[in-house]
């Protein structure tokens, strides 16, 4: 189940390649989220390696922002710790370059730091560092033309979120302009681990009619939940808050992360 780690001198793996590889094996993907620089840049190397060793197929690496509107308290606190530890854009790209993982890396951040850095420059430097995709939850699809253009120029996937409240008309726009995977929000509100998978998840999966892989996130924390989401028709399960909480607690972090990633991936595999 563990995914081999290697240096990325020969370029980053595309998200579509990873999903094609998993599809051939009839496997669903585990996408693991952590915040870059929490509790330190140095610690992030071991954290990412632990998730990949546990079976994570894609890593979503957060870049901290001071006003993270889509994040719950757990991830907000992680962002504050990362900012306090000195994480900035240049350090983020340096960290990404040094990770040396074979799995695709997705950057999740907010539009303000991207805009201040320069949209085209940010995307170019992200691609150069080894990022394969970009998630910016606070930019509407209607306002993302420049960002989409830069992503196409440098070969990054631009990944949009779809919520139960998203209209069918907007879903169609997202399916036209998004790539890599579609991020389905399994419940309303901000991120955070929750007790069970909502009924709206199945309904949302049925509304999003596309060949682009569908990834469900926000609130998944156990292998049983991951299996339920996979059985409901998701191509991937996104898990974040529970990993970030383990990091915050601080004891035996990498061992716990690897064990939980293995449990989640086993749940996904068992749902086939």
Curated annotation (Swiss-Prot):
EC number: 4.2.1.20
Highest taxon listed in the record's lineage: Archaea
Molecular function per GO: tryptophan synthase activity
Active-site feature positions: 60, 71
Top EC class for this record: lyase
UniProt xrefs under CDD domains: Tryptophan_synthase_alpha
Pathway: Amino-acid biosynthesis; L-tryptophan biosynthesis; L-tryptophan from chorismate: step 5/5
InterPro entries: Aldolase_TIM, RibuloseP-bd_barrel, Trp_synthase_alpha_AS, Trp_synthase_suA
Gene Ontology BP, a term: L-tryptophan biosynthetic process
One GO CC term on file: cytosol
Reactions catalysed: (1S,2R)-1-C-(indol-3-yl)glycerol 3-phosphate + L-serine = D-glyceraldehyde 3-phosphate + L-tryptophan + H2O
Keyword Cell division: no
UniProtKB keywords: Amino-acid biosynthesis, Aromatic amino acid biosynthesis, Lyase, Tryptophan biosynthesis
Bilayer-crossing regions: none
Subunit relationships: Tetramer of two alpha and two beta chains.
Protein family: Belongs to the TrpA family.
NCBIfam families per the UniProt record, alphabetical: trpA
Protein purpose: The alpha subunit is responsible for the aldol cleavage of indoleglycerol phosphate to indole and glyceraldehyde 3-phosphate.
Listed name of the protein: Tryptophan synthase alpha chain
Provenance organism: Methanosarcina acetivorans (strain ATCC 35395 / DSM 2834 / JCM 12185 / C2A)
Name of the gene this protein is made from: trpA
């Amino acid at each position: 189940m563990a995914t081999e780690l290697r240096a990325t001198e020969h370029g980053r793996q595309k998200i579509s390649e990873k999903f094609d590889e998993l599809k051939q094996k009839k496997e669903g993907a585990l996408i693991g989220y952590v915040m870059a620089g929490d509790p330190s840049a140095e610690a992030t190397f071991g954290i990412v390696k632990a998730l990949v060793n546990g079976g994570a197929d894609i890593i979503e690496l957060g870049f901290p922002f001071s006003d993270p509107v889509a994040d719950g308290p757990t991830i907000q606190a992680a962002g504050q710790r990362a900012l306090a530890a000195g994480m900035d854009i240049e350090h983020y790209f340096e960290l990404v370059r040094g990770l040396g993982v074979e799995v695709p890396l997705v950057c999740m951040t907010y539009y303000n730091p991207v805009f201040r850095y320069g949209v085209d420059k940010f995307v170019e430097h992200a691609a150069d560092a080894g990022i394969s995709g970009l998630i910016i939850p606070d930019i509407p699809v209607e306002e993302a033309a420049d960002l989409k253009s830069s992503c196409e120029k440098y070969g990054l996937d631009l990944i949009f979120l779809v919520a139960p409240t998203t209209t069918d008309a907007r879903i169609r726009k997202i399916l036209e302009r998004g790539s890599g995977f579609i991020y389905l929000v399994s419940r309303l509100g901000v991120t955070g681990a929750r007790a069970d998978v909502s009924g709206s998840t199945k309904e949302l999966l049925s509304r999003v009619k596309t060949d682009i892989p569908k990834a469900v996130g926000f609130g998944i924390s156990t292998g049983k939940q991951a299996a339920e989401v996979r059985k409901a028709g998701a191509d991937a399960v996104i898990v974040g808050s529970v990993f970030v909480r383990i990091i915050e607690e601080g004891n035996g972090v990498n061992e716990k992360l690897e064990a939980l990633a293995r449990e989640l991936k086993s749940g996904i595999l068992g749902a086939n």
